[in-house]
Amino acid sequence: LARELALKSDLPICPGLNNNEINPESLEKKCSDIGFPILVKSSAGGGGIGMQIASDYSQLVEAIEKTKNLAEKAFGNSDIFLEKFIENARHIEIQIFGFGEKRAIHFYERDCSIQRRFQKIIEESPAPNIDKDIINKMSECAVNFATNQQYEGAGTIEFIYDRDEHKFYFLEMNTRIQVEHPVTEVVTNVDLVEMQIKFALKMDNYTSEQNDVNRSEHAIECRIYAEDPSKQFLPSPGKITK
């Protein structure tokens, strides 16, 4: 659904197939047209859970089955979709705030390209070493998308940037405050949680115009993953004593 809505808002989407387009009779031909490697993703998933990369068709068949099984167990929904895997990529997300009634603004970008197991480790704003014109175009697309959905509240629209082709594609929208929102708050000096509360209470003393949003700092957020390297990096949150 997100890909369909993105297309209606004229956002570029990564070449791929939706769940209803995946059928054995034509799958190999369609995937050949997309080009390998291909990423298999759960439609209901998040946080990189269950994502598989396939370098050829035989790997793809196996990855589809694995992802479906994991998605059913984790999310109660086995639907999947396929996307062209961008090998030399940057992962950029735009923080937006929508006011409904066809109006939204952005609070600049966060770079979350440094990842492990498809999960973000470093969040940074401004994004280093990327053309400002690309960031501006992403921001424009993000605002247009939120505006067309008459979106209300804070949200994040994520893009993948192909460094070889100098193109970017819509990935997904997170319709909530994310754990990395403090990065944006630091660089813009805007409390997004407070803003959400004030908007919900129909108060009017918060940032509501794009011209009022300024960025004057640089911020980096690092996530800590509690894992035990001696046990093949199994989760290791520590011993609960109380």
Tell where the protein language model's regions lie, with residue ranges.
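A conserved helix-loop-beta module that forms one wall/lid of the active-site cleft
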Residues: 1-43, 50
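ATP-dependent carboxylate activation and anion-phosphoryl transfer catalytic cores
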Residues: 9, 42, 47, 54-242
